Amino acid sequence: MSLPFLASFKKTVAKLDTVGVGIQKTESWLSTGNYALNRALSGDFMRGIPVGKVTLFAGPSGSGKSFIAGNLCLEAQREGFHVLYLDSEHAIDVDYLGKIGVNVNDDALTYISVTTIEDVNSVLSEFFSNYTKTYGKDNTTAPKTLIVLDSLAMLSSATEMENYAKDGIIKSDQGILAKRRKAMLRLAVGQLGRLPIGMVLTDHVYPQDIMMGDGSWAITNSTKFSSSIIGIITKLKLKEEAEVIGVKMKFETYKSRFAKLGTKVTLEVPYNKGMSSFSGLVELLEEMGVIAKGTQIGEKLLWVTEVNGEIIKFKEKDLDKATAEKILKHPLCAPMMARNSVPEVSIEEIDAVTDQDEVPQLDTEALIKKSRKVKLTTE
């Protein structure tokens, strides 16, 4: 039943600075630049992090959180976003950002060094205030922005800094820190919902007491409740013979309103060129039952699948965008993609696959027979 005063009521409350009227759907996404990571975050190979919400990458020191943040800056700039980078670690690697293609000029990336939670509050308040004065709320034509805060764990409080200046001793009150961090995140979440702005946080995680718990990583409650998506990253060294040439990381979906929890992907991020779009994709597609191991040619393994009647055969090192996007039209991939991007697959086919308890296994033997007369798709 409609109430007669609703029209004027909505018009009045819409004028309030901190109020929004109407349900906001997540319609804008920013790709991470990596298909497997996209899928783990959003349940969709083509989408990555949601605009208008908070995404958290958490992990132990040196796990690669800042590398992921750097790649997101690159993808954001490719999509026309401005990047606001808040750095509490004071360790941003401009050379690395330049190597992977991030534009660090002021017109493309605004870099601000912060020390305390109060610093972040002031910066965000000023930015949101100026943004809404210039473009208003719910403005679909306003320029998009990505805010990166790297990292939450290194932020102190103004009280800590005052005590240090007075006594030369760092006195940390975790209770005060937690409350102020929570207030800062409330401010961000409240503003982001009506603006074309995405926010990425990095944070440390801490091992729980193995004697009292399961030995898994612990995430602070303030970030757990304010983030729409949380991924936990752990690190391996990426080596070429004995030389360490980058970061090899394991990513696991800890929280997501859009994807299956517990999804795991392994990603490689070389120092000299950043993350490949295809890193982790072959392993994920094999796990899903989308592709199968075909024949061996020398030391190289061929992978095969069949999509819409077409046999697709490729070597992992030769996988390219055109081949990957053909494979991602496979019905088993369709539930994880925007349906309007895969018109060849009917809704009935998607539902039939989604409703199955187990992923159907590929008939590898039949596929190999069919593929013998087919040239490599990537040739």
What are these regions (language model features)?
Residues V54-L56, H82, K144-V148, G198:
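Residue-level preference for the first positions of well-ordered beta-strands
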Residues D173-M288:
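Phosphate-binding/switch region of NTP-binding enzymes
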